């Protein structure tokens, strides 16, 4: 049996649908979770979907993915711009890592244009709202050779 794709979402993403919907869209995190699970199922895969506002929890889950996941999709949110510890954890993985953002960081404030996570990512999907997660699932599925 193929291991699941782990999908991690960072700080403030629990507020999707209500926090700056003009930037992040109206979909809630539960909506995103359902869309990810449905997209993975079409490819014969499952998803472990988690969110935390705490850097240490995200790092623990990245480390868990080393043995429990076939690929990792991560929306690091603000930690992407600040967390070398998260980068170091991601560098320990030997599975595809897809960085995912709802908005396009390159089209936003200067401080959002650099992400440490990109240094460890296989690829990046950004700017498509909640569909960014689905596109990241699709990319991960392709990289692991799913149906």
Curated annotation (Swiss-Prot):
EC number(s) recorded for this UniProt protein: 4.2.1.10
Enzyme class: lyase
UniProt-annotated catalytic positions: 24, 101
Catalytic activity: 3-dehydroquinate = 3-dehydroshikimate + H2O
Keyword terms of this UniProt record: Amino-acid biosynthesis, Aromatic amino acid biosynthesis, Lyase
Assembly and oligomerization: Homododecamer.
MF annotations from Gene Ontology: 3-dehydroquinate dehydratase activity
Organism: Caulobacter sp. (strain K31)
UniProt entry tagged with the keyword Amino-acid biosynthesis: yes
Binding site residues for substrate: 75, 81, 88, 102-103, 112
Record-level GO BP terms: amino acid biosynthetic process; aromatic amino acid family biosynthetic process; chorismate biosynthetic process; quinate catabolic process
Full protein name: 3-dehydroquinate dehydratase
Function: Catalyzes a trans-dehydration via an enolate intermediate.
